């Protein structure tokens, strides 16, 4: 039976490229001259650490990160920005958590949406992904269109399509 998986994966190399592009842009921008600004990607615990001189620069850094992620085809919905915290040197810092995988409640919403559509497919939650199977590939493509039209708070990718 044809099937596919609904997943939430972040291409870490593309995210690394986006972070490096932000670093280059910070070096060349006039409004960031003579200020301490850091952005670094921690691959192990899947987070990005931002450090800026003040909140205005932090907002600019956040906007640059989101726009560079879009350019690199990384959905900015996978970035969860934590609260801005002051540091001892009068600067501000912020952690950005990279969300990967589909949580249980989001997976349940996806399965409920598929079941409510009355299409002849079955959806099953498997760890951090949802497997959708059906008798016809056309039904599976309708499910993909249905899920693309909805907002679940996380970016969704459709992989492993088997006929």
From Swiss-Prot:
What Gene3D superfamilies does its record include?
A: 3.30.70.860, YajQ-like, domain 2 (3.30.70.990)
Which cysteine pairs are joined by S-S bonds?
Answer: none
Report whether Nucleotide-binding shows up as a keyword of the record: yes
> Which keywords annotate this record?
Nucleotide-binding
* MF (Gene Ontology): nucleotide binding
Please name the Pfam families in this protein's record: DUF520 (PF04461)
Q: Which InterPro entries does the UniProt entry name for this protein?
A: DUF520 (IPR007551), UPF0234-like_C (IPR035571), UPF0234_N (IPR035570), YajQ-like_sf (IPR036183)
Q: Does the keyword Ribonucleoprotein apply?
A: no
GO annotations of cellular component type: cytosol
The domain of life for this entry's organism is: Bacteria
* Family statement drawn from the similarity comment of this UniProt entry: Belongs to the YajQ family.
Query: Per its database record, what is this protein's job?
Result: Nucleotide-binding protein.
Descriptive protein name:
Nucleotide-binding protein DvMF_3058
